[in-house]
Amino acid sequence: MQPQLPPLKPIPIKDRISVLYVERGNLDVLDGAFVVVDKTGVRTHLPVGGVACLMLEPGTRVSHAAVTLASRIGCLLVWIGEAGVRLYASGQPGGARADRLLYQAKLALDDSARLKVVRKMYALRFREEPPERRSVEQLRGIEGVRVRKMYELLARQHGVAWKARNYDHTQWESGDVPNRCLSSATACLYGICEAAILAAGYAPAVGFIHTGKPQSFVYDIADIFKFETVVPVAFRIAAKKPRDPEREVRLACRDAFRQSKILHRIIPTIEQVLAAGGMDVPTPPPESVEAVIPNKEGIGDAGHRG
């Protein structure tokens, strides 16, 4: 009998590259390596085990072997439109667990617990406690007013002409540069947030502020980080009026993600906002599978860097 290969040891989300974009190529596993092959047959190796999210643009084909490997190592594959303006589909990298999903759903279905979670999200986003005796709908309205004012403030700070947050994904090129930059920037953030949510074992669709959409929880979590990361980047790039704003935004977002160490913070933030609901995390049954990206346990004592 042939000896079995040792099990893969996925890299923790916090230690990965945030996002890579692939367009006009074939993703495959050749000679044991995850590669993208262009029309001339040239192979480019992708360190997929160290990437949180691969964004697949038009012209990209993916083999069964590539999808299998991405799933095993916990890399989220997202099929998007050109420049990331639409999300068509995403592949779950095997991280969902019944105990986490039931915990999340229980919080979302309990009105009192849901309100506590929403209030915690508000406090983290705006760095102040929300007004007392407000419903989820009222907090959503207050949040919307504050967000519009923050867009206006950032536009003035960067000298960008601003009307409103509005774009038509069916006529992308007709949109103004600030909105195109914002859409490209938030697409980057949504990708890594969804990858983190799945890696932690939760459901992207079960939201608390946002509801009724496949990525409701993604929007909830992304909104906590949006104005400290991608929104300032989008306005800064828009002020330069580049020829290819989408590409400039992607590169700037990658740098912003690295500098802010956002991948270190997303999963702890998810746990923090859910814990605000005041319900105990259920103990997983003995037969439950391990997380697709388990936390690395050190061999030293508590506090040891190893």
UniProtKB/Swiss-Prot annotation:
Its cofactor is Mg(2+); Mn(2+). Keywords: Antiviral defense, DNA-binding, Endonuclease, Hydrolase, Magnesium, Manganese, Metal-binding, Nuclease. GO terms for biological process: CRISPR-cas system; defense response to virus; maintenance of CRISPR repeat elements. It is an enzyme of class 3 (hydrolase). GO terms for molecular function: DNA binding; DNA endonuclease activity; endonuclease activity; metal ion binding. The keyword Ion transport does not apply. Mn(2+) binds at E143, H210, D223. Its EC number is 3.1.-.-. Disulfide bonds: none annotated. InterPro entries: Cas1, Cas1_I-E, CRISPR-assoc_Cas1, CRISPR-assoc_Cas1_C, CRISPR-assoc_Cas1_ECOLI, CRISPR-assoc_Cas1_N. Belongs to the CRISPR-associated endonuclease Cas1 family. CRISPR (clustered regularly interspaced short palindromic repeat), is an adaptive immune system that provides protection against mobile genetic elements (viruses, transposable elements and conjugative plasmids). CRISPR clusters contain spacers, sequences complementary to antecedent mobile elements, and target invading nucleic acids. CRISPR clusters are transcribed and processed into CRISPR RNA (crRNA). Acts as a dsDNA endonuclease. Involved in the integration of spacer DNA into the CRISPR cassette. PANTHER family: CRISPR-ASSOCIATED ENDONUCLEASE CAS1 (PTHR34353:SF3), CRISPR-ASSOCIATED ENDONUCLEASE CAS1 1 (PTHR34353). Homodimer, forms a heterotetramer with a Cas2 homodimer. This is CRISPR-associated endonuclease Cas1. It comes from Geobacter sulfurreducens (strain ATCC 51573 / DSM 12127 / PCA).
